[in-house]
């Protein structure tokens, strides 16, 4: 093997190895973009009071853990919990992403939200501010919410 062909071989190997982090980063960026879209869809559905749409954003075995209310496990229970919420309260809130980490087929997002909530029966409105933790799972149908909990911001 000539010096030139050895150099070429080494250069090719180096180029291949150097490209691996970019391929991983590209996949990571794709996952992050998909998760941003999922969070935006959740926000839109929450503000629209659309429990059916929210149900579809969860995994089949998804868990919703609202502060001060029973845990809802599985899509039918999640749907029921959101239906109950929307019968009583309407939201106009915006989520801000504080942290997003992707690790393989799982990810989490830490967010905070602010806006208003309105009591359906009376029309009384007030400020709404919460902290949220979303755990996501990559499924055959894309990223879904696997676990979600929130509490009031202090």
Roles of regions detected by a PLM:
Residues 2, 16-60:
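Short, low-complexity N-terminal intrinsically disordered segments enriched in polar/charged residues
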Residues 32-38, 51-103, 112, 124-127:
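A solvent-exposed, acidic/Ser-Thr-rich amphipathic alpha-helical stretch
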Residues 112-118:
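Generic short beta-strand segments
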């Amino acid at each position: 093997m000539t010096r030139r062909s050895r150099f070429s071989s080494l250069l090719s190997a180096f180029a291949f190895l150097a490209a691996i982090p970019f391929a991983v980063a590209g996949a990571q960026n794709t996952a992050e973009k998909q998760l941003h879209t999922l969070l935006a869809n959740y926000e839109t559905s929450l503000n629209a009071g659309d429990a059916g749409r929210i149900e579809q954003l969860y995994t089949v075995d998804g868990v919703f853990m609202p502060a001060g209310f029973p845990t809802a496990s599985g899509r039918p229970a999640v749907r029921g919990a959101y239906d109950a919420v929307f019968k009583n309260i309407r939201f106009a809130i915006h989520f801000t992403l504080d942290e997003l980490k992707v690790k393989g087929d799982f990810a989490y997002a830490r967010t905070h939200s602010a806006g208003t909530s309105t009591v359906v029966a009376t029309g009384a409105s007030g400020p709404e501010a919460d902290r949220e933790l979303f755990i996501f799972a990559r499924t055959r149908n894309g990223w879904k919410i696997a676990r979600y909990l929130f509490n009031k911001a202090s």
